[in-house]
């Protein structure tokens, strides 16, 4: 009996252990194989850039170059160690708006993440705005320094670069109107907008867009100003697209209402106003935040519709000169827009280049497959051309602010600003898309952060004037009193004058630019003569003209850079040759100018458009 009892107990114990073991094995890690991909690494964007350092070395005096290079190198380390993470978090923790508190009180509380606030603090600490206005530094140097720093910052900035653009534009506007030291609010605003102290620094908004339209400022403005006393007014209107609504001050346009309740229409009726967004108690200044915009990209950035119902503002500048007053702002923000475009282009190339050394496909890394490196090389060539165009704009802006511009340089600044903005914006979207393709399916995955670059880049051809709007602005530049076409030719010839013609590739590059320039000049002169007879519509080819100017100018800059043996290397020569000789610098034909072609365009576009008869088209 004793043996039988032991046997029963052993059998029972064995059964229990089996049950425990069976239950235990229900829990184990999934077997997914040992392979995982290695993502791209963001290196110091200053040290990692193939052309930025050489460009600055050429443009700046040696002592200034050393100072600027040290600052940018240090900032590049901060971008990789801190800024990039903050910008990513701003995308993941997007702003939201609470209209009412729990008790039904209207509060219009804008909630942004801590990372957004930290990024704004970093902008002040790093002097992102103040660098452009430091009295102790030559304006020529400081603008180049500022643009370089913004270029490094922009793709990691979590769209804080947008309020920085508007802040820079506001400082430029207020100082250009000679208000500093003469106007209390303007003086305080300038000091705070360019402050390096995060506890004192302000940011500015610009509220120009209304329901009737964006770029048509004169026709679209439906905001009215009722005078309280000499220069103080109450504003009433609806601002349709207002970015960075957590700003401290804003510049806006409005129509002054006279004593009879009438307001002048058109651009002559617009005046410029400066207002604080909140009063001393922190309450909104006669402003209601109606809603945050649901945008394709730039989701980190709080963009709102605003109802102005008695917002107290101060008129700055002469009455009826509002459009002229914002011209300086637009020049600055358009350069910032180009910085953003090129920042996205450079970032996607840098990440794709790094990834190509890690991703193994068909037995070797992407970097060893000729087709892949050819793709990246084409992207690099186009980016370098526009990068030099950007720093040409920075150089010209600095010379203008220093009062050192020649007549040709002054005209080139007016021409290059819209050309740079529209061309870089038009390049950015397809290039970032191409770069995302370099990552295969991973480029399409939201949690890699790569799609954010594409969505955010899409705004750059739209903000501060679409491609078509700015192309028409380029035509207005040519229709002015100055002979811009002649000045453009002189600048290109000046750049080509240093060409190392003993180098066959540079010689051919120079010939290609000269040929394209002559063709453009011939076509524009011919079109101007025929336009009197109504045979041509030069406006229909405005974007082709603008693109051609961008390519010719960029090509000449690349040749000039590659001919400087003190900084250039063999890749600079190859880039200049590929840019100028392996792709068309001019994409323009005489038959495209014909008035009859416009009629044919309409027939193509509205073929079988059933709503045509009911529309006003």
UniProtKB/Swiss-Prot annotation:
InterPro entries: ACDH-11_C, Acyl-CoA_dehydrogenase-like, Acyl-CoA_Oxase/DH_mid-dom, AcylCo_DH-like_C, AcylCo_DH/oxidase_C, AcylCoA_DH/oxidase_NM_dom_sf, AidB, AidB_N. It holds the Pfam family ACDH-11_C. Residues 11-22 have a biased composition (Low complexity). Induction: By heat. Two-fold induction at 25 degrees Celsius compared with 15 degrees Celsius. Residues 1-47 are annotated as: Disordered. Keywords: FAD, Fatty acid metabolism, Flavoprotein, Lipid metabolism, Nucleotide-binding, Oxidoreductase. Changing residue 158 to R: In n5661; suppresses the defects in egg-laying and response to reoxygenation of paqr-2 mutants. Disruption phenotype: Temperature-sensitive mutants in which embryos develop to adulthood at 15 and 20 degrees Celsius, but have a poor survival incidence at 25 degrees Celsius. Mutants have increased membrane fluidity and abnormal compositions of fatty acid species. FAD binds at residues 206-215, 241-243, 359, 366-369, 437, 441, 464-466. Promotes adaption to elevated temperatures by regulating expression of the lipid desaturase, fat-7. Binds selectively and with high affinity to fatty acids with chain lengths from C10 to C12 and prevents them from activating fat-7 expression mediated by the nuclear hormone receptor nhr-49, leading to low levels of membrane lipid desaturation and membrane fluidity for adaption to heat. Belongs to the acyl-CoA dehydrogenase family. This is Acyl-CoA dehydrogenase family member 11.
């Amino acid at each position: 009996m004793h043996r039988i009892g032991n046997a029963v107990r052993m059998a029972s114990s064995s059964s229990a252990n089996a049950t425990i073991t069976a239950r235990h094995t229900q829990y184990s890690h999934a077997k997914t194989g040992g392979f995982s991909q290695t993502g791209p690494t963001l290196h110091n964007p200053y040290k990692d850039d193939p052309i930025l350092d050489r460009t600055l070395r050429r443009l700046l005096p040696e002592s200034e170059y050393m100072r600027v290079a040290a600052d940018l190198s240090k900032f590049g380390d901060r971008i990789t160690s801190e800024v990039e993470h903050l910008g990513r978090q701003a995308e993941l923790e997007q702003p939201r708006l609470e209209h009412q508190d729990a008790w039904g009180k209207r509060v219009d509380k804008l909630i942004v993440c801590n990372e957004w606030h930290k990024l704004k603090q970093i902008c002040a600490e790093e002097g992102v705005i103040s660098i452009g206005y430091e009295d102790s530094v030559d304006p020529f140097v400081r603008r180049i320094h500022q643009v370089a720093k913004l270029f490094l910052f922009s793709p990691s900035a979590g769209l804080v670069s947008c309020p920085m653009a508007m802040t820079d534009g506001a400082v430029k506007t207020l100082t250009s109107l000679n208000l500093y030291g003469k106007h209390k609010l303007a003086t305080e605003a300038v000091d705070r907008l360019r402050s390096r102290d995060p506890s004192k620094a302000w940011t500015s908004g610009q509220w120009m867009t209304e329901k009737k339209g964006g770029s048509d400022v004169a026709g679209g403005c439906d905001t009215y100003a009722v005078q309280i006393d000499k220069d103080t007014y109450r504003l009433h209107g609806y601002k349709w697209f207002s970015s960075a609504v957590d700003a401290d001050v804003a510049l806006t346009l409005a129509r002054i209402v006279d004593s009879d309740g009438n307001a002048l229409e058109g651009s002559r009726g617009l005046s410029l106003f400066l207002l604080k967004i909140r009063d001393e108690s922190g309450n909104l200044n006669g402003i209601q935040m109606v809603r945050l915009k649901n945008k394709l990209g730039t989701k980190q950035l709080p963009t709102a519709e605003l109802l102005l119902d008695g917002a107290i503002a101060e008129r700055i500048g002469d009455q009826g000169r509002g459009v002229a007053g914002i011209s300086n702002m637009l020049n600055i923000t358009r350069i910032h827009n180009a910085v953003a475009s090129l920042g996205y282009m450079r970032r996607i190339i840098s990440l794709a280049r790094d990834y190509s050394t890690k991703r193994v496909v068909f037995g070797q890394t992407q970097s060893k497959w000729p087709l892949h490196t050819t793709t990246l090389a084409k992207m690099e060539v186009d980016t370098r051309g526009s990068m030099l165009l950007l720093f040409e704009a920075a150089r010209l802006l600095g010379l203008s602010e220093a009062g050192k511009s020649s007549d040709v340089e002054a005209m080139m600044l007016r021409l290059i600003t819209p050309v740079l903005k529209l061309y870089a914006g038009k390049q950015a979207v397809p290039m970032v898309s191409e770069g995302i393709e370099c990552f295969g399916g991973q480029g399409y995955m939201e949690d890699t952060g790569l799609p954010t670059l594409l969505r955010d880049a899409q705004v750059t051809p739209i903000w501060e004037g679409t491609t078509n709007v700015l192309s028409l602005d380029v035509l207005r530049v040519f229709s002015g009193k100055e002979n811009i076409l002649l000045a453009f030719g002189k600048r290109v010839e000046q750049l080509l004058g240093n060409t190392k013609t003993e180098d066959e590739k540079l010689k051919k590059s120079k010939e290609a630019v000269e040929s394209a320039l002559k063709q453009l000049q011939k076509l524009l002169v011919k079109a101007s003569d025929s336009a009197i007879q109504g045979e041509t519509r030069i406006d229909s080819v405005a974007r082709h003209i603008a693109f051609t100017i961008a390519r010719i100018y960029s090509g000449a800059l690349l040749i000039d850079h590659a001919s400087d043996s003190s900084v250039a290397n063999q890749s600079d020569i190859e880039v200049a040759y590929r840019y100028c000789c392996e792709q068309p610098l001019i994409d323009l034909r005489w038959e495209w100018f014909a008035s009859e072609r416009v009629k044919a365009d309409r027939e193509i576009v509205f073929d079988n458009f059933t709503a045509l008869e009911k529309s006003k088209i």
